[in-house]
Amino acid sequence: MAPVSNQAGGHVAVLAFPFSTHAAPLLNIVCRLAAAAPSTLFSFFNTKQSNSSILASDTSVLRYTNVCVCEVADGVPEGYVFVGKPQEDIELFMKAAPDNFRKCLEASVAESGREVSCLVTDAFFWFGAHMADDMGGVPWVPFWTAGPASLSAHVHTDLIRNTTSGDCHDEKETITVIAGMSKVRPQDLPEGIIFGNLESLFSRMLHQMGLMLPLATAVFINSFEELDPVITNDLKSKFKRFLNVGPLDLLEPTASAATTTPQTAEAVAGDGCLSWLDKQKAASVVYVSFGSVTRPSPEELMALAEALEASRVPFLWSLRDNLKNPQLDEFLSKGKLNGMVVPWAPQPQVLAHGSVGAFVTHCGWNSVLESVAGGVPLICRPFFGDQKLNARMVEDVWKIGLRLEGGVFTKNGMLKSLDMLLSQDKGTKMKNKIHTLKQLAQQAVEPKGSSTRNFESLLEMATTN
């Protein structure tokens, strides 16, 4: 356990969901809270594997003497052999999570000598309501890692199930019974709401979450109120408090967070990306990235590469090593492409760079919000989870991007999308709209902005009990 100030203070226990990209943004917020409340202890509970992954690319958390990064068991029984079931690792973790977290909390309290004064959890952990009650009724403050539209869909799951046909092939039916969702079709919703295996452990967990979140002291989210005012106001009416505290990447960094950190291999690679972008024309570069989890097929990756070659537009492609294949490697090694391929890129800085004019993305929420913060319109190829819903909001509600023709990468479809976004009037309108949203995002994190005020409320809630 990291050293902690001897000054008396509260103890905020933070329970992270260790899969996908849930844990890192939660730890980001924890560090900001810790910097503002140095006498409060923040115990961050996450699996060893997830903690290692986060710390491998960002060691800044180690500077905070009042943040303790702790390990919780992954729920996999000793000697267990995985059989390849969908979400097998998630189900094992979730089944054991309540007991495992309780044991870790008891050990943390015993070691630190501080009782838990506030419980912050990933929103998936609906059982946080019961844990908070068992600890004497401390505040339970869950964090929703995706966007407000997907949160609204989960909170209104029963209403959606009772009022829609559930026909995922009906292109005309939309979700008209929920504020701000009139452009959303049933097939845009995440699995587990009206299609998919509704009886899986994961689907039942999400349904229970939607029922329990209104009991929370507050729910907070990495977004800003001005992006989705209608949905935000509806969620405010459903929760005791609903706090938009983003975009996180635009929040004023603390003095501690702004200090120089040792250069990791990824940081060096990032410097190379930014130096290359410095040499390109304004708004000319297409940035391509599918996050850390999504896996497009080899056929789609080849179609994308062929389209980039044919378009001759400069591009920066963050291509993970586990997505490469011999055919793609051979194609990329020919040297005919007008761009740069790297295994990792510092995405917020890339999207904030003036040379970037388009973002080809899987539409994960963090990527969408970072694109808004950077003022870069999107070309969307969603795959799973909330990504289809995010893409629908991008194209039909905010009108700051477009989805691929046919929904998958083809050479011709990608060329059409690039031409439309970079060269046609429709693309100019998208750029203007996302520039307006960028300005609203910047205003939200100003000293008197909505996200700054909400962050201050979150800080007070977490540290004054």
UniProtKB/Swiss-Prot annotation:
PROSITE patterns: UDPGT. Its EC number is 2.4.1.115. The keyword Glycosyltransferase applies. It comes from the Eukaryota. UDP-alpha-D-glucose binds at residues 145, 345, 347, 362, 365-367, 370, 386-387. One of its GO terms (molecular function) is quercetin 3-O-glucosyltransferase activity. The active site is at 22 (proton acceptor), 122 (charge relay). The keyword Iron-sulfur does not apply. It is an enzyme of class 2 (transferase). An anthocyanidin binds at residues 22, 87, 154, 385. It holds the Pfam family UDPGT. Keywords: Glycosyltransferase, Transferase. One of its GO terms (biological process) is anthocyanin-containing compound biosynthetic process. Pathway: Pigment biosynthesis; anthocyanin biosynthesis. Highest expression detected in fruit, with very low levels detected in petal and leaf. It catalyses: an anthocyanidin + UDP-alpha-D-glucose + H(+) = an anthocyanidin 3-O-beta-D-glucoside + UDP; pelargonidin + UDP-alpha-D-glucose = pelargonidin 3-O-beta-D-glucoside + UDP; cyanidin + UDP-alpha-D-glucose = cyanidin 3-O-beta-D-glucoside + UDP + H(+). CDD domains: GT1_Gtf-like. Belongs to the UDP-glycosyltransferase family. In the presence of other necessary color factors, this glycosylation reaction allows the accumulation of anthocyanin pigments. Anthocyanidins are the preferred substrates, while flavonols are only a minor substrate in vitro. This is Anthocyanidin 3-O-glucosyltransferase 2. It comes from Fragaria ananassa (Strawberry).
